[in-house]
């Protein structure tokens, strides 16, 4: 890490500033606070200032050429969303246009900024992973505090509907998203020492389980199963012992925790917590405006929306259905093309660790998080999309 602070043998103010901003942005992804808002704006401004000061227009042009497919799809997606907003002013949310602008700045320009500074060798993949672990570590401290002060109400409670770990966040599903991501990140990013790897996996798995986020459970299980199958030959006895120990812990928790047993039973019984009602409604409404949809944030303002009778049904809870509702089939095509391109890039460059993390996010977003307004999941997806393209960029 220290090498990135220097340029031509001397400390570089540009590099130190960038790494500080990158650390703040990566770490603040896991918290709903002003630091994230400030850091993503500062990162964008720093990118613009560096570009103009050093006149690195050729580097930016080269990056755009190497990422032209995903860039064109992103522009077309935003254009589709903007047209949909214009055609549906009566039902879009009050912050629809602001959210559309932030969609560009938080994800589009940040993606370019990461590619730009990576091309200049300001940081590497390990730095990104380290900064993400910093944020996850801080969040974990708040989870431990909640767990210590409310163990009976969470682990040994008989009410799994209102319980669950949330840490410093307001929502257990968001914590589940982060802890599941931390679990997968620990599996693919921590190589040595194994004691640190296993400790991180244990903590993130425990926190994920008691967030009671079933989407995170399913996503992490599928992603780690995929990663394990790819690395069967490299797994030794220590990994086998850890797996056996984890299964034993799982069985003990199942026996001792009524709330965990309830959530697991709900998962296997197919209890959707109202999601099937939401999804059926979206599919029905999408048939009326299939091409461009209803505009950003329109779900809560549409006639007969499930949220009118059930306030807890306040979001589409499915990435693809949200795209279909807000930007129609056209948006679905462009968004799907971006996803396909990123996954293809991972496979071609053999970045199966990044692919594992993408699989986790994609599965989780089929049940809990959306395509346009879920800044937590989308910020992580932006980082992973950059990592998928980094091999192409550095050629």
Where are these regions (language model features)?
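Membrane-interface helix-loop-helix junctions at transmembrane boundaries of multi-pass membrane enzymes
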Residues: 4-15, 51-71, 189-199, 231-241, ...
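A membrane-periplasm/extracellular boundary helix in multi-pass inner-membrane enzymes
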Residues: 231-270, 283-288, 296
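Aromatic-anchored transmembrane helix interface
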Residues: 72-76, 93-118, 127, 131, ...
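Hydrophobic, aromatic-rich transmembrane alpha-helices
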Residues: 2-5, 41-58, 181-190, 330-348, ...
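Alpha-helical transmembrane segments of multi-pass inner-membrane proteins
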Residues: 109-112, 126-160, 167-233, 337, ...
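Transmembrane alpha-helices of multi-pass inner-membrane enzymes
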Residues: 19, 26, 42-50, 354-366, ...
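Long extracytoplasmic/lumenal interhelical loops at the membrane interface
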Residues: 266-280, 284, 288, 292-327
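N-terminal signal-anchor transmembrane segment
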Residues: 1-55, 77-90, 361-363
């Amino acid at each position: 890490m220290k090498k990135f602070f220097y340029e031509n043998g001397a400390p570089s103010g540009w590099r130190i500033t960038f790494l500080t901003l990158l650390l703040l942005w990566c770490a603040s992804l896991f918290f709903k606070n002003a630091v994230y808002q400030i850091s993503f704006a500062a990162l964008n401004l720093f990118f613009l200032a560096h570009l103009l000061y050093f006149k690195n227009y050729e580097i930016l042009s080269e990056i755009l050429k190497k990422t032209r497919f995903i860039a064109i799809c992103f522009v077309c997606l935003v254009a589709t969303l903007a047209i949909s907003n214009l055609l549906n002013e009566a039902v879009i949310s009050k912050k629809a246009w602001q959210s559309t602008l932030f969609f560009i700045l938080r994800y589009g320009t940040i993606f370019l900024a990461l590619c730009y500074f990576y091309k200049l060798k300001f940081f590497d993949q390990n730095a990104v992973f380290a900064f993400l672990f910093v944020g996850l570590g801080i969040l974990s401290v708040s989870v431990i505090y909640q767990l210590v002060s409310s163990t009976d109400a969470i682990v040994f409670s008989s009410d799994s509907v209102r319980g669950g770990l949330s840490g410093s966040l307001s929502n257990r599903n968001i914590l589940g998203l982060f802890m599941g991501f931390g679990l997968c990140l620990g599996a693919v990013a921590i190589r040595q020492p194994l004691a640190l790897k296993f400790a991180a996996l244990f903590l993130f798995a425990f926190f994920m389980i008691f967030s009671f986020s079933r989407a995170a459970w399913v996503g992490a299980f599928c992603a780690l199963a995929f990663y394990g199958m790819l690395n069967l030959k490299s797994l030794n006895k220590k990994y086998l012992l850890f797996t056996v120990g984890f299964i034993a812990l799982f069985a003990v928790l199942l026996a001792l925790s009524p709330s965990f047993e309830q959530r697991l039973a709900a998962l296997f019984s197919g209890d959707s917590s109202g999601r099937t009602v939401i999804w059926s409604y979206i599919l029905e409404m999408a048939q009326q405006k299939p091409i461009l949809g209803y505009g950003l944030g329109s779900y809560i303002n549409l006639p007969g929306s499930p949220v009118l009778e059930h306030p807890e049904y306040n979001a589409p809870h499915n990435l693809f259905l949200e795209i279909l509702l807000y930007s129609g089939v056209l948006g679905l095509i462009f968004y799907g093309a971006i996803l396909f391109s990123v996954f293809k890039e991972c496979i071609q460059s053999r970045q199966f660790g990044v692919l594992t993390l993408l699989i986790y996010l994609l599965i989780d977003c089929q049940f809990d998080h959306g395509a346009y307004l879920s800044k937590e999941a989308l910020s992580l997806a932006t980082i992973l999309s950059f990592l998928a393209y980094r091999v192409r960029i550095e050629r």
